[in-house]
Amino acid sequence: MIRAGVGQSVDASTARAAGEAVQMALAQAGVSKADAVLVFFAAEHAARERELVESVRRVAGTDCVIGCSATGIMTASGEVEGGHGLAAMVLGAEQLHCRPLFFQPLREREFDIGVQLAGMVPPSEATGSLLALFPDTYNGQPQRLLESLHDERGFTPVVGAGASENGTAQATYQLSGAGVTNNAVAGLYLDGAFQAHIEITQGCQPISDPMVITKCERNLIYEINERPALEVFSSLLKGPLAADLRRALMVLFVGLPADRLINSVSAGKYLVRNIIGIDPDKGILGVAEEVSEGESLIFVMRDGQRAREDLTQMLQRQVNNLGGRKPAFGFYFNCCARGSSLYGIPGIDSAYIKQALGDFPLIGMFGGYELAPLGRANHLFAYTGVLTLVTGEDA
C-alpha cells in the first residue's frame, strides 16, 4: 500500500511553517516518519534555509528531501498565491521506491545532466516509473536536458515545473536534504508497483486557422503564408487589441507543433510559446522557440473561460483513466500565469480537481513553466496545468 499525505502552512516563521506542514502530512499518511518529502515554498523562506531544511528533516525523519521555491502552492485544501505559503508531501511504501536527485550547476550543463540522469534512473522492471524535475527557471534550458535524457535512454515520462518566485528575490531556489541553492535542478525519481496517469490542460484558445511559416531564421519569423509575419498577426487583432499592440502581445501567443515530424497544430498537439518581440519596419515576429520553414503555426489567445472548459475536459479524462480507483496521491504543476491572474478569482484549479476527483493527497505549485509528456516525448509547456495521478496495484 502506498502511503502519502500532504500539509500546508502560511506561517511567516520558516521553522514553524515547515514543521506544521510536514506534521500534517505525516498525520494524513498515517506514518510516523517518511521515506521521502517533497516541499514547495515561497521564496521568502529561502532566506532561512537552515531552518527550512532542518525542520523538514527532523519532523519527517528522513534526509530524502527535494523541492523548490514557487510563486504559489496548492494542496487539496486550496491554493496560496504569494505570501509565505509552504506545502509538503510525505511518501512511504514498500511498493514505491523514491530516489532524490540534485545537480548543480545547471547553466550550460543541460546535456551532461541529461546523460547523468539516464545513468542514474535506468529502465525499471517495475510496473511504473516517474521522474519529477524542478529546474531553476532563470538558469538553463530544460528542453536540452529533456532531449539529452531521451537520446540516452529513450522515453521516460517526466513531469515537473520551473522553480519560481514573486519577482522580488530575482532568483529561484532548489531544495535538497543538504540545503537550498540556485542554478540547480532538483528531482525525484519514483519506481515500483504503481501507475502514473498524466494529463495536461491548456489555458489558450486558437484564434486562427493553421498556417505555415514560409520564411524564418532561428526564432525570427519573417513570413507566414508568404505574407509578412507581423501583418498576418495584426490582421487577427480585434477591438481594443487592434489599438494596443503591447496589450495584444500579453494575451496572444503562437502554437507550434509538439512533434515536428507530424507537423500538426490540431487540438492537443501544439505547444504554446510567447511572442517575445516584433520589428514593425521589417514585419518580423520573434518567438520563444527556434522554428523552421514549412512548419505549421497557429495563433492562440489566453482565455479564462476557455481554460475552465479545458480543465473540465482534462479532469474527465482523468476520471476515465482511474476507472473508479482512488488516487494514492497526485501532483499538479500549474503555470504562474494561471490562477487568479487568469480566472479573476483564486482557487479555481484546486476546486475543480476536488469536485471531479474527491479528496486525496495532492500537492502542487505555480511554476515558471511546466514539464510533461505529449505522445512519446517530453516537452516544456507554458500557460498549462499538468495533473499527475498515481494509483497503486492495490487501488
Per-segment meaning from a language model:
Residues 1-36, 41-50, 55-57, 63-64, ...:
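Small-residue-enriched flexible segments
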